């Protein structure tokens, strides 16, 4: 059975069992900012399992694209060395949200494996959690599996409920036992059954994991039964395909073999067994789908993981003799294999290839030189087996070699890298680049808000509704008195709840009491009105009049509609690769984050602004339609990055063919209502992500008027017209730069003179020189210049300089290269800085710090000679 046929067979089977087929979610989780990538099928249903979202179905099945590279779940370093590790894989899964439970879940798994796929029953065995007698009995009595084929796995991870067969979202929240199905590859493969000392061998391979979420674990470890137990299952498509196709390695299945052949062709090798071809075939899958889902190569977070994988693939191509660009050429082959199942790949394949090519070209500039540095470092190790952390860092910092790429080369040469030494220099980067999932929830102390609030605010800003619930500090109460604040749930409301980047409405609830609504948020489908009771008593059951602040709502609508016009303008001017990465829409302004590789030029800036204002002047009707998600996609509606949509969606259209987007927010009636659109700033907020801030309506007019007024004042200072003011400012700036250059020259001469004088104060210490001095300089740059001058004059020295200005202490330490083995500038600074209530750090040869306590400086300087003497 081909991989594509297996995928469809799984989905069709569970569809026949009344499961809703749900599309694979993005590799970038939209509902969990702590998770680097989607790494399991259940991720897109996390909010459902936690009771925070309600779907129109209680059974679902998916083929989920997953990535395990970076963060807690990281298979990158093993890809290419084992038969089953991948950075990208597909997880087949079926899910029950309070519907069926253990009996049906086990029956479905067994029927699909043995009846649909026709796997021989004698090849299968299962594990259950040691205490899960119910699952054991279902396997034994209902399925008929003999006792010797059912293995109980206890708490084998160091604590209660810490087991391979007990699954939890986090330290608290939903959890429960699981049962796993294993396939026996036969006695000719080394390995033992699960739970045995030889369980890590390849003979018995887990193919399906069925999790029974039946408990809620509180912070104190107490386990309580969930009112609606659920089921979460996962089966790796590649693993089961290998079994069905009669091969032992995932890389031998049809999907991978076709990619390996394509990789061999583009790198120019005929050896299809080359390990590097496996790496390249795996990496083109993860890299391509990351880019499809909006990830762009960068030096932090998800973008850095993508960059690491791309560069690892390039290095393996280089290892096979391919010195030119090649990786991007494999996108076409991948589309042939997976485009039918994932049409988003076909749609964006040209963009994917373009981004990969750009990254290849960038890395090609330093790859050969970096490899030479690494090879020299390896040859110079002698009998040592560890590449120094400083070398690993240099390769990263100067030549763009991720540490795991260097480790890959080291591993091929029977070596290791000094990870601890590298981490000292890279700690901050590693913290940004690596994140792990931490699902956590303590449901025992939370208030349940069931049902859904009927939202009437698309057509009305006033109404009447009954108070259904009042919440104060997480507890339901019967009433609120004047002066008290809380959350109010109404049966229906015109107040928009904060979502989709749009802030929540404000206004009033009036009835027996007068309550100011300061914000409106949402929990699931329930609107929570944040109220401050100004008069009377507000009680559950009261009938209240709802009044949305019309001026704030209208101002917000201007900005929200403008973001749609802006989004489309950016796509038309910059390219289809532009994707929304985030937004904030409030009454004052709009903020729009989008993917783009570089800063916008002045011409692009003007073109985007002009295009939006043209749409405003055309005064298009803003049309809203409600339709099913498939019809919306067929209409060409853009789904915004990270947003979750239900089966019925609102489609917002501006102009017959200009902007069509899915959006649940509130908007103007016609684009002309926006009046004027004015961009006030554009800049980068992360690698590959830009941010535009803009104003609309009266705020845009006021900003333009303010700029005109400021320009008039500047022109007045120069006694020039507004048109000539720019030339005057440019001339003044040129003059200032010339004077600054003269000043820098003078400061350099002064530093040289001061250095000559200070150098004579250096003392001999164990064959080197030591200079500790407080100097009179006005800025950190002058202090650095003085340090450089002294290092040049003293040749072999440890130097610590201090300066005090405006009650602030500046410290700088320098160590000449030959002494850094024993004395490191960073360590010296860390010793001295606390005495002046400061902190700092730096490299072994130069480090800096700042402090707020000049009184402690003398004592700190007195300690330096003894500290240095102990080390040189």
UniProtKB/Swiss-Prot annotation:
Record EC number: 6.1.1.7
GO cellular component, one term: cytosol
Gene Ontology molecular function: any one: ATP binding
InterPro entries linked to this entry: aa-tRNA-synth_II/BPL/LPL (IPR045864), Ala-tRNA-lgiase_IIc (IPR002318), Ala-tRNA-ligase_IIc_anticod-bd (IPR018162), Ala-tRNA-synth_IIc_core (IPR018165), Ala-tRNA-synth_IIc_N (IPR018164), Ala-tRNA_ligase (IPR050058), Ala_tRNA_ligase_euk/bac (IPR023033), DHHA1_dom (IPR003156)
Class in the EC hierarchy, top level: ligase
Entry keyword annotation includes Nuclease: no
Swiss-Prot/TrEMBL keywords: Aminoacyl-tRNA synthetase, ATP-binding, Cytoplasm, Ligase, Metal-binding, Nucleotide-binding, Protein biosynthesis, RNA-binding, tRNA-binding, Zinc
GO biological process: alanyl-tRNA aminoacylation; negative regulation of DNA-templated transcription
CDD domains: AlaRS_core (cd00673)
Localization (cell): Cytoplasm
Record: residues binding Zn(2+): 560, 564, 663, 667
Gene3D superfamilies in UniProt: 2.40.30.130, 3.10.310.40, 3.30.54.20, 6.10.250.550, Bira Bifunctional Protein, Domain 2, Threonyl-trna Synthetase, Chain A, domain 2
Domain of life: Bacteria
Known role: Catalyzes the attachment of alanine to tRNA(Ala) in a two-step reaction: alanine is first activated by ATP to form Ala-AMP and then transferred to the acceptor end of tRNA(Ala). Also edits incorrectly charged Ser-tRNA(Ala) and Gly-tRNA(Ala) via its editing domain.
Similarity-based family: Belongs to the class-II aminoacyl-tRNA synthetase family.
Domain note: Consists of three domains; the N-terminal catalytic domain, the editing domain and the C-terminal C-Ala domain. The editing domain removes incorrectly charged amino acids, while the C-Ala domain, along with tRNA(Ala), serves as a bridge to cooperatively bring together the editing and aminoacylation centers thus stimulating deacylation of misacylated tRNAs.
HAMAP family: Ala_tRNA_synth_B
Name of protein: Alanine--tRNA ligase
């Amino acid at each position: 059975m081909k991989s594509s046929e297996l995928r469809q067979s799984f989905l069709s089977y569970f569809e026949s069992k009344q499961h809703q087929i749900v599309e694979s979610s993005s590799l970038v989780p939209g509902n969990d900012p702590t998770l680097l990538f989607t790494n399991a099928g259940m991720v897109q249903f996390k909010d459902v399992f936690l009771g925070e979202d309600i779907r129109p179905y209680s059974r679902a099945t998916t083929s989920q694209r997953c990535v395990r590279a970076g963060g807690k779940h990281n298979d990158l370093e093993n890809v290419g060395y084992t038969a089953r590790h991948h950075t990208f894989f597909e997880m087949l899964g079926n899910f029950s949200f309070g519907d069926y439970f253990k009996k049906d879940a086990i029956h479905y798994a067994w029927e699909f494996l043995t009846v649909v796929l026709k796997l021989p029953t004698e090849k299968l065995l299962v594990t259950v959690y040691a205490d899960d007698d119910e699952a054991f009995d279902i396997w034994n009595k209902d399925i008929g599996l003999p006792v010797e084929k059912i293995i109980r796995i206890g708490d084998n991870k160091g604590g209660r409920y810490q087991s391979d067969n007990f699954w939890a979202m986090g330290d608290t929240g939903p959890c429960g036992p699981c049962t796993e199905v294993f396939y026996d590859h036969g006695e000719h493969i080394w390995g033992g059954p699960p739970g045995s000392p030889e369980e890590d061998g390849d003979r018995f391979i887990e193919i399906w994991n069925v999790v029974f979420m039946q408990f809620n674990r509180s912070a104190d470890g107490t386990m309580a039964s969930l009112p609606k137990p659920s089921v979460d299952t996962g089966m790796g498509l590649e693993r089961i395909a290998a079994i069905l196709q009669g091969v032992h390695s995932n890389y031998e299945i049809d999907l991978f073999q076709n990619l390996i052949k394509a990789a061999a062709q583009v790198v120019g090798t005929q050896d299809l067994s080359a390990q590097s071809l496996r790496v390249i075939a795996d990496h083109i899958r993860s890299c391509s789908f990351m880019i499809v889902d909006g990830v762009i190569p960068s030096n932090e977070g998800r973008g850095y993981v993508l960059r690491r994988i791309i560069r690892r693939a390039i290095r393996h191509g280089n290892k096979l003799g391919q010195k030119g660009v090649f990786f991007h050429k494999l996108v076409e082959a991948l589309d042939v294999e997976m485009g039918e199942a994932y049409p988003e790949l076909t749609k964006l394949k040209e963009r994917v290839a373009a981004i990969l090519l750009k990254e290849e070209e960038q890395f090609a500039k330093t790859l050969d030189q970096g490899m030479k540095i690494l090879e020299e470092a390896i040859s110079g190790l002698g009998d040592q087996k560890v590449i120094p952390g400083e070398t690993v860092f240099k390769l990263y910092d100067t030549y763009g070699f991720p540490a795991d790429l260097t480790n890959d080369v080291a591993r091929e040469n029977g070596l290791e890298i000094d990870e601890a030494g590298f981490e000292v220099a890279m700690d901050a980067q590693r913290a940004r680049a690596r994140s792990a999932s931490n699902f956590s929830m303590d449901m025992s102390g939370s208030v349940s808000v069931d049902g859904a609030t009927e939202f009437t605010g698309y057509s009305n800003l006033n109404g009447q509704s009954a108070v259904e619930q009042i919440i104060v500090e997480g507890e339901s109460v019967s009433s609120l008195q004047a002066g008290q604040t809380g959350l109010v749930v109404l049966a229906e409301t015109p107040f928009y709840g904060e979502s989709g980047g749009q802030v929540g409405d404000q206004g009033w609830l009036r009835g027996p009491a007068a309550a100011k609504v300061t914000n409106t948020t949402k929990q699931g489908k329930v609107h929570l009105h944040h109220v401050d009771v100004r008069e009377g008593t507000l009680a559950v059951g009261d009938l209240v009049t709802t009044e949305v602040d019309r001026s704030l709502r209208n101002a917000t609508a201007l900005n929200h509609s403008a973001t749609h016009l802006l989004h489309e303008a950016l796509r038309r001017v910059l390219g289809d690769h532009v994707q929304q990465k985030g937004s904030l829409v409030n009454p004052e302004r709009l903020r729009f984050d989008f993917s783009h590789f570089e800063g916008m030029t002045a011409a692009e800036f003007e073109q985007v602004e002009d295009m939006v204002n043209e749409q405003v002047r055309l005064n298009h009707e803003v049309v809203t339609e409600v339709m099913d998600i498939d019809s919306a996609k067929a209409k060409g509606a853009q789904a915004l990055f990270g947003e979750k949509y239900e089966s019925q969606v609102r489609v917002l259209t501006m102009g017959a063919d200009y902007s069509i987007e899915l959006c649940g927010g509130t908007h103007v009636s016609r684009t002309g209502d926006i009046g004027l659109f004015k961009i006030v700033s554009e800049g980068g907020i992360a690698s590959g992500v830009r941010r535009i801030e803009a104003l609309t309506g009266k705020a845009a007019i006021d900003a333009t008027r303010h700029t005109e007024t400021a320009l008039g004042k500047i022109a007045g200072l120069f006694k020039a017209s507004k048109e000539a003011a720019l030339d005057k400012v440019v001339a003044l700036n040129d003059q200032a730069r010339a004077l600054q250059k003269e000043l820098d020259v003078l400061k350099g001469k002064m530093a040289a003179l001061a250095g000559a004088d200070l150098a004579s104060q250096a003392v001999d210490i164990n064959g080197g020189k030591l200079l500790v001095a407080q100097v009179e300089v006005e800025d950190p740059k002058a202090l650095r210049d003085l340090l450089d001058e002294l290092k040049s004059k003293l040749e072999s020295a440890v130097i610590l300089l201090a300066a005090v200005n405006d009650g602030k202490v500046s410290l700088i330490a320098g160590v000449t290269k030959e002494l850094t083995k024993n004395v490191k500038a960073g360590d010296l600074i860390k010793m001295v800085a606390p005495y002046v209530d400061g902190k700092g750090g730096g490299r072994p040869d130069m480090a800096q710090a700042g402090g707020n306590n000049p009184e402690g400086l003398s004592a700190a300087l007195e300690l330096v000679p003894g500290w240095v003497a102990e080390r040189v």
